[in-house]
């Protein structure tokens, strides 16, 4: 009989769970009980609630994300990069009876200190779905990952997503703005500025000045700022992209479209994989191996 197992993406603010029989998803559930929102409950109690009537005898549970961080259930030690893809699923941390956490990855060099949790599971899936030498994983903190067919060799992090949120919501740039609207032209204009002048710090106040002076519609500041930051990010990582024969984007639909536009402007072809699809493929491969 094909093995039954539970796969969980447990982040800071949300928890998503899937019940599988082999490669077939039998059920899925979602909770707002991220590791920073447990409301006094233990992680074990939350897991028991979410997986009620799912676990039969010793059904394996494999978890990824911030659940393995120092604010989660238990620290799942980072694996140092370079790291073989196969080693990720071989060094799981146990927190209970057949309940396991996938390790994160880290880099610690004189010129590069970085960590990731959750993205390593997406990488395992993306490697199967769209093999590449460079994986770009947009989000709050965009990961740029160099890899070959066997191992992850290096990665960097660019905080464009968080910077956009902070500037728009907690700085003078976004103060007093009306509700923002989608505006492809404003995004494209910001993208061009960022690609052509990636030293973005001197340009940030100009975003405010532009809407104060009326040259940028106040409802389109978010779109222009998004383009500016993504353009600057992609341009500043130009050396990381150089000589890469294949680039895979791993993200949701909206961010994929924005980064595709940036790469196309640089003359780079990319393949896109949905972030959720990559994550589920990655965690299934690990959980399936554990269950069998």
Which residue ranges define each predicted feature?
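Short beta-strand-loop/turn "lid" adjacent to the catalytic site in phosphate-handling enzymes
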Residues: 54-113, 149
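Glycine-rich phosphate-binding/hydrolytic loop that grips phosphoryl groups
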Residues: 235, 268-292
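Glycine-rich phosphate-binding loop plus the immediately following alpha-helix
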Residues: 38, 106-193, 197
């Amino acid at each position: 009989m094909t093995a039954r197992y539970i796969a969980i993406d447990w982040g800071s603010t949300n928890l998503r769970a899937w019940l599988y029989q082999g490669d077939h998803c039998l059920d899925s559930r979602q909770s707002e009980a991220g590791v920073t929102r447990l409301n006094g409950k233990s992680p074990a109690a939350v897991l028991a609630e979410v997986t009620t009537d799912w676990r039969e005898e010793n059904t394996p549970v494999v978890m990824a994300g911030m659940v393995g961080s120092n604010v989660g259930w238990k620290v799942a030690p980072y694996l140092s990069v370079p790291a073989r893809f196969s080693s990720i699923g071989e060094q799981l941390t146990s927190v209970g009876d057949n309940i396991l956490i996938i390790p994160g990855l880290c880099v610690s060099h004189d010129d590069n200190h970085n960590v990731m949790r959750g993205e390593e599971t997406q990488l395992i899936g993306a490697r199967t779905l769209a093999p590449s030498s460079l994986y770009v994983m947009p989000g709050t903190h965009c990961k740029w990952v160099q890899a070959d067919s066997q191992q992850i060799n290096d990665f960097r992090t660019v905080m464009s997503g968080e910077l956009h949120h902070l500037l728009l919501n907690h700085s003078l740039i976004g103060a007093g703005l009306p509700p923002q609207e989608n505006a492809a032209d404003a995004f494209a204009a910001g993208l061009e500025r960022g690609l052509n002048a990636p030293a973005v710090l001197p340009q940030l106040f100009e975003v405010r000045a532009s809407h104060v002076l009326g040259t940028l519609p106040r409802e389109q500041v978010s779109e222009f700022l998004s383009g500016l930051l993504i353009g600057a990010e992609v341009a500043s990582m130009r050396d990381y992209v150089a000589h890469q024969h294949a680039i895979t984007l791993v993200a949701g639909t909206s961010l994929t479209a924005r980064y595709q536009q940036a790469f196309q402007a640089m003359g780079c072809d990319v393949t896109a994989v949905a972030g959720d699809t990559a994550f589920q493929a990655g965690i299934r491969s690990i959980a399936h191996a554990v269950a069998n």
